[in-house]
Amino acid sequence: MEKVPMTVAGYQTLDEELKRLKTVERPAVIAAIAEARSHGDLSENAEYHAAKERQGWIEGQIAEIEDKIARAQVIDVTKLSGKQVKFGATVSVVDEDTEEEARYQIVGDHEADVKSGRISLSSPLSRAMIGKEVGEVVEVNTPGGVKAYEILKVEWL
C-alpha cells in the first residue's frame, strides 16, 4: 500500500469528517430509510429511494476516508527544518514578471486549497520547488506560458 504524505491538521480534518459521517450522517440516513419504509410501497416511494441513494453516497465517503487514513503518512511539519523546500514547507515566492508575492504551504493532495494558500505536493509549482533553496528561481509551465518564481523564504510553521 502506497503511503500518502499528510500534515497533522489534514489527518485531523479527515478523522473529524469520518467521525461525523459515522455518528451523525449514517444514523440519520438509516432513520430516514426506516421512516420511508413505514410509508408502504417502496417501488414508488421517492423518499425511500432518495434516502437509499444518500446512504450509498455516505458509505462511499466513509470508505474513501478510511482508505486515505490507512495510507496516511502523517508528518508534523513543526518538527521539520532545513533550507530546502520539501513537503510541509511554507514557501514565499515572487513572480518574476509581475513582482507579485505569494506564500504557499506544500501539503497532501486532499488538503490542497489554493485560496487558503495550500498547494498539493503534486502540483506543478510544488514539483518545481522541491529541493530548491532561498534565492533559486524555478520555472513552471502554465497554460499562459512559462512562469518564473524566485524563492524568497522557506518556513516550517
UniProtKB/Swiss-Prot annotation:
InterPro entries the record matches:
GreA/GreB_C_sf, TF_GreA/GreB_CS, Tscrpt_elong_fac_GreA, Tscrpt_elong_fac_GreA/B, Tscrpt_elong_fac_GreA/B_C, Tscrpt_elong_fac_GreA/B_fam, Tscrpt_elong_fac_GreA/B_N, Tscrpt_elong_fac_GreA/B_N_sf
Keywords, ordered alphabetically: DNA-binding, Transcription, Transcription regulation
Q: Output the GO biological process annotations, alphabetical, semicolon-separated.
A: DNA-templated transcription elongation; regulation of DNA-templated transcription elongation
Q: Which Pfam families match?
A: GreA_GreB, GreA_GreB_N
Query: Which residues fall in a coiled-coil region?
Result: none
The entry's family comment says: Belongs to the GreA/GreB family.
Question: What is the annotated role of this protein in its UniProt record?
Answer: Necessary for efficient RNA polymerase transcription elongation past template-encoded arresting sites. The arresting sites in DNA have the property of trapping a certain fraction of elongating RNA polymerases that pass through, resulting in locked ternary complexes. Cleavage of the nascent transcript by cleavage factors such as GreA or GreB allows the resumption of elongation from the new 3'terminus. GreA releases sequences of 2 to 3 nucleotides.
This protein's name: Transcription elongation factor GreA
Q: Which organism is it from?
A: Caulobacter vibrioides (strain NA1000 / CB15N) (Caulobacter crescentus)
Q: Which gene codes for it?
A: greA
